[in-house]
Amino acid sequence: DMNRDATKQNSVEARILSAWADEIKPEFAFNLHDQNRLYSVGNGPEQTHIAFLATTGDEDGTWTPSRLRAGQICQRMLRQIQHIIPGKIAKWTDEYESRAFGDTFSSRGYGLVLLESGGAGWDLEKQSLRKLNACLLLDAFCAIADGSYVSESIEEYEALPTNERAIVDIKIKDAPLSSSVRADV
């Protein structure tokens, strides 16, 4: 997994990406992922369609200036789509992972926005989410170009429920395992 190769940089691609980022020193970086469609918004029944994260650069989760910029972009993107997919937006877990490029780039002062595409019902190819992502990215680029993102707070972003694993494909309740034992599996 190249995304977990930021520290050791065993792959050629990891070395190229790291060197290039250090050369250009971006104010912002975007990390786009497809997350498992079984993630839920908090521990509820709603499937997470989109999850955001203004990636931390240390184990304390410090809000550095670069992380704040990323948080303002997350806030902006959240405001753009919360009326389109209400109740289906979450925040990716904020645990620091030193091997990950997002966390590593954030520690170097690059405002890293993680954008995770989850599930959208039975749209298993995530085409509807890809369209949303394209719109979100275009809007974020415009907000960065004109500086309008700086007026964003991060309150709504911070209040987002986290991604959880509360959804399953199949749940069998009260299954007989033997004549005297029953269980949910």
Where are the language model's segments positioned?
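C-terminal accessory segments enriched in acidic
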Residues: 24, 53-185
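Active-site/substrate-binding loop(s) of hydrolase catalytic cores
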Residues: 1-87
